[in-house]
A protein has these predicted regions:
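Amphipathic alpha-helical segments that mediate coupling or scaffolding at interfaces
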Residues: 43-44, 109-112, 116, 137, ...
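Generic hydrophobic transmembrane alpha-helix motif, especially the helices
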Residues: 95, 99, 105, 126-205, ...
Length: 319
């Protein structure tokens, strides 16, 4: 009898495990940016000068934010300080002494930090926005657009900065927002020149040319390729623009063009000078505000120079 060969047992098929999906281009781009930011922060932390400046700025910003908790704003009004001794030197009751009206200089210092930082930061934002917009449009589009915008920029650069700011502040009137507008509208040309030079370099790179050849729109090229590469320059320039804005606010307030209803470090210096604090040797009146301005400007400069060095390989090589 013929034997029928046995068929081999069927081996169950292994389940097919789908391979993990590859990340899209947007995810890859964001991952690269996060990695780059992590590297920048690591280099920033290793820079002792940058960390000292950052700690100072955080401390002063915390003091400004907590001003209503640390001091009573009503003490800034002379009608509430008639019982305080005028020209009192620093003591346990009045940490920084009092002014000619009996107001606490420490309260003026704490609340003055809020206005000085507010003006410095908001004016810097306005400066960076206008300067970046003009620089990107001029550098990317070129032609008559670039020519017109650069002539406008040159016009602002030719006119002396401080006299123009004084005239505009006088026309607009004394207020915090007028000072912010004046500083922003007179300092953006320096940013636009820097951004335009960076855009002219970036738009000649191969990946930008390839994106154009593939039919990418101008807005896509600017948003995906130009701005991310100009960003580090803008970031470093921002930290260096804030001290300029603070010094400008101090100058305008000292000249009597600031908001008379708000305490600021510049206004404190102006009132101390008008009250004769220098001739009376009342150093406690003007010294805290002066030291505060110097420390904040120095701290922002330290952070800005460190960022500039981290983001610019040429500066790292020189060091």
């Amino acid at each position: 009898m013929r034997m029928i060969p046995e068929l081999p047992e069927a081996v169950p098929a292994e389940p097919v495990v789908p391979s993990p999906a590859l990340p899209g281009p947007h995810a890859v781009a964001w991952a690269r940016r996060r990695r780059a930011m992590a590297e920048i922060w690591l280099a920033f932390r290793r820079n002792r000068q940058a960390m000292v400046g950052l700690v100072i700025l955080v401390a002063i910003a915390a003091m400004a934010l907590l001003a209503p908790v640390l001091a009573n704003e009503e003490a800034l009004r002379a009608v509430n300080t008639v019982d305080n001794p005028p020209w009192a030197s620093p003591s346990r009751e009045f940490l920084f002494g009092t002014d000619n009206l009996g107001r606490s200089v420490a309260v003026q210092f704490v609340f003055g930090a809020r206005i000085s930082l507010l003006v410095g930061l908001f004016a810097t934002v306005l400066t960076i926005v206008i300067g970046t917009l003009v620089g990107v449009v001029a550098g990317f589009f070129g032609g008559w657009t670039e020519s017109a915008l650069m002539r406008l920029t040159d016009w602002f650069l030719v006119i002396p900065f401080l006299p123009l700011a004084i005239v505009l502040a006088r026309i607009l009137g004394p207020s915090v927002w007028s000072i912010i507008f004046v500083i922003g509208i007179t300092t953006w040309p320096y940013v636009s020149r820097l951004v335009r030079a960076q855009v002219l370099t970036v738009k000649q790179r191969l990946y930008v040319e390839r994106a154009r050849a593939m039919g990418a729109s101008r807005w896509h090229v600017v948003r995906r390729h130009i701005l991310p590469n100009v960003g580090p320059v803008i970031l470093a320039n921002t930290t260096l623009t804030v001290p300029i804005a603070i010094l400008t606010e101090t100058t305008l307030a000292f000249l009597g063009l600031g908001d008379p209803t708000r305490a600021s470090w510049g206004k404190t210096l102006q009132e101390a000078y008008d009250a004769g604090a220098i001739t009376r040797n009342a150093w406690w009146y003007y010294l805290p505000a002066g030291i505060g301005i110097v420390v904040v400007v120095l701290a922002f400069t330290m952070v800005g120079r460190a960022l500039e060095e981290i983001l610019d390989p040429r500066l790292r090589e020189r060091r």
